[in-house]
Amino acid sequence: MKYYNIDNYIRYKQDLEQAYKRLDKSLSYEEYTTDELVIIFMPLVENIARKFATSQQASGCMSILDLIQEGNFGLIAAINRIEWDTINSSDDQEKTLKSFLSKRIKGAIRRGVDMNRGNIRIPEHKLNKIRKGFDNNKDMVAMFFNSIFSSLD
């Protein structure tokens, strides 16, 4: 398993805390800038990254800081894709926004883990097929594993 530098993690937490203190808490989500939204939702990214780090999905191929970094890339991309009309029309804006962002963050972390796992790079569409239909499609799984083992011969 890859280890992370504790000093860097402590510095990251301190910087995040200082940036969070500087935010104006009286604004609605729509009134914040992109950078401010990133700062607000960085704890969500860290939460999701920690779940990946402790589960089998990351399986020791990336450190927690790498997972947080991939999650932040997904957070920035998700913030740029927010449709504020949909968020404003919902009953619970915070819940809607967090569920939208968490889906994008999880996808970015999953993609980062897939790219850094192992020596054989598998195309993303094949990984998605395997992930979705692992129980239902035995032929896909057999083809996937047979192609790996035949390439080792």
What are these regions (language model features)?
Residues 114, 121-153:
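Charged, low-cysteine interdomain linkers and short loop/connector segments
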